[in-house]
Amino acid sequence: MTNWATLWPNDRLFLSDTYQLIWFDIEADRIEHKHFKAQNSEDISMIPKGFVSFVDNRLPMCINHKGEVYIRVGSFDTAYYQKFGDLDVSDFDDQVLPPDRDFTFNKVVFGDVPQEQLDNQIRDLQSEVSILTSRNVEMNVRENDLLKKVSELEKQIRQSSHNYEKVVEDGVVLSYRKAGGLLNRMVVLNRRLVGQRFVTNQRRWENIIMGSGVHDGSSYMAFNFKESGGSLKVTFDFDKLQNLSPDDLLAMQIA
């Protein structure tokens, strides 16, 4: 495909403020959307830098080699180019224009835009604002949902790093203690808390206390029992263990 920049200079070829090349099919003060087309060129080096620096960071507009300046009005399919005037480009060479350069227009032809056209532009802009507002609301809702999910995941991660879960089976040991040279432990047997003492000379554990039954929702020290997936499970909560006071421990009953 031909790079339109190679056609410069040409009366109908214009350089826009976005460095697009604009081609006018007709010569008129007002160029409707159907009478112009644009091309994105990766190489506009053949266009003098004076023209390139003139359009840089300006309002939506375009200029040709003769200095004819057109202002872009509207957007999308309703956009058109309206001639603003003829700029003196006699010294536009391949040097970048100084930032304080003054520009002289030989003729200004840009007049008032018809009220009907202004009304159409206002409606188009209002429609765009409505669409953007709707999208912004959707994005805010989506963002809130994602933040909630992140918060839930962080909570699960914290819990998983501070808890240990195991299926309750006979013989699950919950705690050990040693007092007066005797070794004791708390286990679960037949879904009951059972205190046991180690008989040293017989090398076996014997039951000394039959405590309360364990079920979904019951607890013992830092252990919580719950039904899950058809099984009774016990969860050890490190955070809860850290927060138990001596009074809490003394008040605990297993019978």
Curated annotation (Swiss-Prot):
Keywords in alphabetical order: Virion
Family: Belongs to the tobravirus protein 2b family.
Protein name: Protein 2b
The organism's place on the tree of life at top rank: Viruses
One GO cellular component term noted in the UniProt record for this chain: virion component
InterPro entries per the UniProt record, alphabetical: Tobravirus_2B
Compartments in which it is found: Virion
Function: May function by interacting with a small, flexible domain located at the C-terminus of the CP, forming a bridge between the virus particle and the internal surface of the vector nematode feeding apparatus.
Pfam families documented for this protein: Tobravirus_2B
